[in-house]
């Protein structure tokens, strides 16, 4: 039975809205809805009905299913097939205003606080392109080694949905801002490492739609009502479309993670998946190994982390292989990743290609760029993740250390500044990845939120190197430097923690310890050499851990063996 929906729009909209909800609710009738002029906000709109979303049983783990080969060898079922995976990524840009109007584009505002006639689609309101959107598109295109279009245009992508007030989305169709690029990925060492290059088909500029908020449930199914928040409508996006060149969930997750690092290094987006600043739709099909023809494509949505993406792909690979082994047909559809049950569920059928009836946007001129503009933008690009990893490797760091340090642009910048102070590479890396990272995690701060400066950490490491303090003392001082700031030398002096390095003072200390522990001295000289640690411990206790360990051991051994 058809399900009805109504939508009340506010902000003085004096027109009727004709729409069809395209969610997984079966065949819905068209409904003409009068809008409420002058209402203070967009209000209750969607009455809930039973969802047709199908929860399917978890597939048999096909990767452990085997069959006998003619030679007597066994072959897992999954060895017969390969996945073909492509990703469409929407990157929400961090511009201060929206793509085609002056409304703020900030995340987390009160619903419908950042709206105007343009992003609400009111009659007569005309868009004006935000130049920062074009700049971001060119930066990302150049970072991807793509071809930048000297002349591109915007198009109207037409479809009806409650969160799309204009009835179309301003996007780019046949002439995008950038085409034919690639991303280089270093796979994690724990998964065997290796280098991969994945093609990027295109990058195009577009605007985001609004957002449906489902009361009583975060999904339409089971919600008591739904409301529309248009704060996100008109927020600028860059859509990055990959070539279908990934074959595993790990490769797909690492591709997406590298793209996230790239947009963060460029400073064009925070890439936060939990906030929706980076949304990935995965297209996956299965085919027998050796076959060129693609299988039936299934789209997966609702993955808000890279681990969820990897698990969703692996589940879907198992599900599709199991269907093929049973002789069943794979349906072309959109499926949702459900975190709770750790499986994909059917959302809606996608038989055939959607007809969005693209045509050129008549209210916006072509985007015309000069070669000089492109060259200047290229010259001002920051060092990108892949180049930074290669540089760190050239400094002698392991691939594991390189991946950790270059993963976060802020951590990498901090590390580079510490090195500029003359700190030895491995020492700087060990402190940042070890004690600094551990304390930041315990107090839930990022490296940019902490009071510790690169100069202060470099100074702390220098104090260890010149013998002013021991590593133990440095670790005691570090939390204060992270939480309160200040110089390492100042903290050492104010607490009286300078290392005791005067040979005469250390010799006097050792003489007293040996005099107080005559039996242990005799036992040591009788062959129990492990007692050396006992004497060192006594010296550390007497000095509060401040005695220079190198000098201590030298003087102690001379006294014990003399």
Curated annotation (Swiss-Prot):
- The record's EC number reads 6.3.5.-
User: Which residue intervals make up region (Disordered)?
Assistant: 48-76
Leading EC class:
ligase
Report whether Chloroplast shows up as a keyword of the record.
Answer: yes
Please give a single GO biological process term from the UniProt record: glutaminyl-tRNAGln biosynthesis via transamidation
Q: Which InterPro entries match?
A: Asn/Gln-tRNA_amidoTrfase_suB/E, Asn/Gln-tRNA_Trfase_suB/E_cat, Asn/Gln_amidotransferase, Asn/Gln_tRNA_amidoTrase-B-like, GatB, GatB_C_1, GatB_Yqey_C_2, Gln-tRNA_amidoTrfase_suB_CS
Q: Where in the cell is it found?
A: Mitochondrion; Plastid, Chloroplast
Keyword Nucleotidyltransferase, does the record have it? no
The source's superkingdom equals Eukaryota
What reactions does this protein catalyze? L-glutamyl-tRNA(Gln) + L-glutamine + ATP + H2O = L-glutaminyl-tRNA(Gln) + L-glutamate + ADP + phosphate + H(+)
Q: What Pfam families does the annotation carry?
A: GatB_N, GatB_Yqey
Question: Which residue ranges have biased composition labelled Polar residues?
Answer: 64-76
Keywords, sorted A to Z:
ATP-binding, Chloroplast, Ligase, Mitochondrion, Nucleotide-binding, Plastid, Protein biosynthesis
Q: Which GO terms describe its molecular function?
A: ATP binding; glutaminyl-tRNA synthase (glutamine-hydrolyzing) activity
One GO cellular component from the entry?
mitochondrion
The family database entries (NCBIfam families) matched by this protein are listed as: gatB, PRK05477.1-2, PRK05477.1-4
Function summary: Allows the formation of correctly charged Gln-tRNA(Gln) through the transamidation of misacylated Glu-tRNA(Gln) in chloroplasts and mitochondria. The reaction takes place in the presence of glutamine and ATP through an activated gamma-phospho-Glu-tRNA(Gln).
Q: What else is known?
A: This protein may be expected to contain an N-terminal transit peptide but none has been predicted.
Q: How does it assemble?
A: Subunit of the heterotrimeric GatCAB amidotransferase (AdT) complex, composed of A, B and C subunits.
Family classification: Belongs to the GatB/GatE family. GatB subfamily.
- Entry protein name: Glutamyl-tRNA(Gln) amidotransferase subunit B, chloroplastic/mitochondrial
**Gene that this polypeptide is encoded by:** GATB
